[in-house]
């Protein structure tokens, strides 16, 4: 399990699982990929800084949108 603190909206998590076949619980492991890429999400950063994390989880490349809030990684 990642050592960072993660949070997300459970309704959005269920919608993401249905649409993309990956839960936010699974997505947090993308941050552990030593070859992960973190990139700024300029398109969605007008109200707060948002980022992408692209990493490999169980053989799949996952793209995770997130922000930092009060020391916690918030997944969208």
Labelled PLM ranges:
Residues 1-76:
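Ribonuclease/tRNase effector modules and their secretory precursors
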């Amino acid at each position: 399990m990642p050592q960072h603190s993660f949070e997300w909206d459970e309704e959005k998590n269920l919608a993401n699982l249905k649409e993309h076949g990956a839960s936010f619980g699974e997505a947090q492991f993308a941050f552990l990929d030593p070859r992960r890429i973190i990139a700024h999400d300029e398109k969605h950063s007008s109200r707060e800084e948002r980022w992408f994390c692209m990493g490999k989880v169980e053989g799949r490349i996952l793209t995770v949108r997130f922000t930092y809030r009060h020391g916690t990684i918030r997944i969208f």
